[in-house]
């Protein structure tokens, strides 16, 4: 029989495992693939395979991340797991692996630990919509009361960071025991817990809105003028869909201007529409070449506004990662590389924070010298003389 062509009929969701070091994130990832593999919905990935995460570069920053794929009856998942805590911080801040939801792994033997809190905070800061909890290492706990206590602590922690601590699903099990069942080819009570966890993920983590359905946005990379036709801007559509004759805003640096799209071109062909991911040239009515520049964006009218001041969660690269050798202080003035351009800005550190050392992550305030199209969740790099020294994500617009 001919091999079936891969058909994406199920909705696709990106998730990841988060939690304190050694609480069993990678073991759980292996257990999920193993249990689902027995159900014919995944390929088994063993622990070492996942733990030896390949290096990736995102915005000039090296991150170790493992990606596995699997399916449930209802959905197709891409799952990310990071070996080290610093990799999580970098991953979440750069958005290297966007998460539509997360599985928080907490060892029932330990309860919430410092990185448990930090990963929940980061998830809040970078806009992860929902968290499902897996209480791991249940085979080592025989005290029912202790379990209830740990569950209560985790729920309180979720609520503290504005997740739905009261209603978040909490599943207790043992990733290691489930893996042992998988290896023995005998799915038993521990594997059932993994299936219960995945049923909770299926139900509780919302299906993300597809990029093509979001409000149109395209960062401008280049500007040309075509004699007799007008001005063309080029770039890759970040989200949404653009149609011929749509109105668009040109946002950034100068007061926002609205204009009409009189042509869309891709691979030298005229098109009626283009969507997220496409590299296109867009012809704009009545716009002169010097009225538009790299670093501005084309956007659905009214959907995004220019700002100069915002709060951000930032990771400062270590010296080994090519970052600064020394800390930076209040009033630090680097370039902020936002979408397609560098803009100078100054840094205001929170009260009580004297300086930021290479390798730290910190919440700070940025004031740019020129207004740029920004919103919560916009990612940026921090650069000095073209060299990346940090990464950040906008967490709150101030003005």
From Swiss-Prot:
Against CDD domains, the record matches this protein to: EF_Tu (cd01884), EFTU_II (cd03697), EFTU_III (cd03707)
What InterPro entries does the annotation carry? EF-Tu_GTP-bd, EF-Tu_GTPase, EFTu-like_2, EFTU_2, G_TR_CS, P-loop_NTPase, Small_GTP-bd, T_Tr_GTP-bd_dom
Q: Which reaction does it catalyse?
A: GTP + H2O = GDP + phosphate + H(+)
Cellular component annotations (GO), alphabetically ordered: cytosol
Q: Return the annotated region ranges for G4.
A: 136-139
Residue ranges of every copy of the tr-type G domain listed in the record: 10-209
Residue ranges for the region (G2) are 60-64
Pfam entry (one) = GTP_EFTU
| Sequence segments annotated as region (G5) | 174-176
Q: What is its EC number?
A: 3.6.5.3
Q: What HAMAP family has UniProt attached to this entry?
A: EF_Tu_B
Q: Which family does it belong to?
A: Belongs to the TRAFAC class translation factor GTPase superfamily. Classic translation factor GTPase family. EF-Tu/EF-1A subfamily.
Question: How the protein assembles, per its UniProt entry?
Answer: Monomer.
Q: What is this protein called?
A: Elongation factor Tu
What is the gene called?
tuf
